[in-house]
Amino acid sequence: MVADLEGEGKVFGLFGILDGATVKNLTIGAPEGDASELTFSAAGTADAGVVAGACMGSCIENCVSYVPMYVKGNSVDNKRTTMAAFAGFMYTGVEETEVSVLKDLVNYGSIKVEAGANTKNGATSVHGAGIAGLSNRHTESTFINTINNCVNYGEMTSAVPRTSGILAAANQYTVIESCKNYGNQTNSAAGTRVGMITCVLGGQCHMRDCENYGDAIMTGANAQVGGLVCLLNDNSVEVTGGGNYGKVISDIDASPAGYKGTLAANFSKFAKVDNVVAGGAVGKYNGGEYVMETITEDNYMDYIGKYSSANAEKITNIIFKGEDVKTPGIATAQDLIDFAAAVNSGASIENWQDAQGTVVLLNDIDMKDVAVWTPIGNGKFSGSVSGGNQHISEYEGAAFTGVFDGKGYSIRNLKLVADLTADQTAYGLFGILDGATVMNLTIGAPEGD
C-alpha cells in the first residue's frame, strides 16, 4: 500500500473509511517472507492505517499487523496527518451505536514518521502510533472511544512531536485500557510532546492499567517526554493502574525543573493519578552518552514529571520500582529451557508471565544449539481405563496448565527426538497440556529450519 495523498480529506489503507462496520480475526503481513508495507506522503489532511484510514463508529478486534509503516510527511503545514496499524483516525458519533472500539489488537510493524513541511506539535501535526493515530468525537457526543487490550511491539523512528506506541493523541472522550507498549522510540524532532502510550490525554480521556516497557530516546532539543503520557490536559483526565518500566531520555531538564518524567512530562490539568508504577529510569541524551539521574525510594516522586503543589494531592499511591526491570517473557533458547524446567519442577513461572499471567514469547527463538529437548509439562500417563466410548486417563508428574502466547513469533530448529520406552509417555514441545491454552505460535519455517 503506497500512495501520494494529494488534496484534503484523504484516507488510505486496506479499508479507507469504516462506518458502522466490524473488522475482526484478521492478520495482515507475516513475520518473514512478506513484502507488505504502508508508505505514503500527504499534501493536505490525511488519515492512513494498515487496516483503516478512518474508524467511524466501528469496531476492529482480534487483528494482527506485521506491516512496516512509513509516513514521509505532509508538504502542507498545519494539516492533520495520522498513521497507525489499525486506524489512522478514530471517531465516535452522537448515537450509542456510533461508538468506535479497538480491542485485542497486536502490532509488530515498525513505525517511521517524518514531518515534511508540517512543523506543528498539536492536533494538526503529523501523528504516528502502533494502534491508532488520533481519537476524537462529534462535538455533541458524550460517548467514548475505547482502545482495550492492545499491544505494540513495533520499533518507532520519528522526526515529529507526536509518536506513541498505542495512540498518538487521545484528543477527547477516549479510554485506553489494559494496553502495553514494548517498542522503543528514537525521536530526533525538536520540541517533542512524546508519551509512550499516548502523547496527550484531553477532555474525558482516561488511561487504565496500561504499561510501557519501551525506551523513549529523544535526541532533539527541548524534547518533552513522559514514560506513559506527555501532557495531562483536562480537569477530567484520570490515570489509574499500570506503570512505566522504560528509560526516558532527553536533554531537557528532568522534573521538577523541566518537562520530563517516568510517568508524564506535564501534569497540567487532571482529576487524579492513582496506583501507578514509577519504574524505569530518567536521563539526559548527552550526544548518545546518557547521563542518568539517581532515583531512589526517597526522591522518586521528584522524577515522575512536572506538577504544581496544588496538584500534588491528586497524585496518590505511586509505586517505586526503580530501573532495570526485565520485560517478562521468553526471549532466548535458554529462557525456554529454564521455563520448561520451572514447570516440570513445580517452581514459579512468574519471570515469563505478563501482568495477566500469560507466558509470552518476546521474539523468535532459535533452538539450533539445544541437542536434547525436555518437554514443558514432562509428566507421563500412569494408567487408563477404556470401555465402550469412554476413556479415562491419568497422569503423574508435571503438566502445563496456563496460557502460552507465542505473539506470532516462531520456535525454530527444535529437535524433538525421543525414545518412548515407557508406556503412554507424552512428548513434544509440550508434554502434557491440562486445561491449558497455546496460541499464536509458529514452529519451524518453510526454509532454513
Which ranges hold each PLM region?
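Surface-exposed repetitive/solenoidal architectures
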Residues: M1-D449
